[in-house]
Amino acid sequence: MRYSFGFTLAVMVVALVVGSAVGTPRTNLVSSACNGQKIQSGSSFYSTLGSLLVDLEGNTASSGYDYKASRAGSPTAYGRAVCNQGLSQSDCTACLKNLGGRIWNICGYAIGARVQLTDCFIRYEQYSF
């Protein structure tokens, strides 16, 4: 059976569109901005920030793909996470968990950071924004 070039091309385009809409999130580093000040060793901010990142990772997808939160501490940690709205909820969460695991390496324990992957973004600071 022979298929026309147009039919073959249409099948390939549909496969690419479906493949990009379903599957793993794209986690290539797009940009980062890291505060030059670092979290002090033994600082309570480290655990406060860790708790905030877990909250952002776990609640962004179920909160409309754009979620802000804070964790009381000394100092308080403020954060925001955003996902590409074309992702499934599980892919949004997976992207943010990937980023949460890499943010320390990208920004070297900075007291504030903004990191954008292709399909998700996290920002955290010691001040409200």
From Swiss-Prot:
By its UniProt entry, which Gene3D superfamilies does this protein fall under? Gnk2 domain, C-X8-C-X2-C motif (3.30.430.20)
Residue ranges of domain Gnk2-homologous in the record: 27-129
Kindly list the cysteine pairs connected by disulfide bridges. Answer: C34-C107, C83-C92, C95-C120
Keywords in alphabetical order, please: Antibiotic, Antimicrobial, Disulfide bond, Fungicide, Lectin, Mannose-binding, Plant defense, Signal
InterPro entries, per database record: Cell2Cell_Antifungal, GNK2, GNK2_sf
User: What is a single molecular function from GO for this protein?
Assistant: D-mannose binding
Q: Give the top-rank taxon of the lineage listed in the UniProt record for this protein.
A: Eukaryota
- Which residues does alpha-D-mannopyranose bind? N35, R114, E125
**Any one biological process term the GO annotation gives:** killing of cells of another organism
Q: Where is the signal peptide?
A: 1-23
Q: Does the keyword Signal apply?
A: yes
- Briefly state the protein's biological role: Exerts antifungal activity through its carbohydrate-binding specificity.
What is the protein name for this chain? Antifungal protein ginkbilobin-like protein
Q: Which organism is it from?
A: Pinus pinaster (Maritime pine)
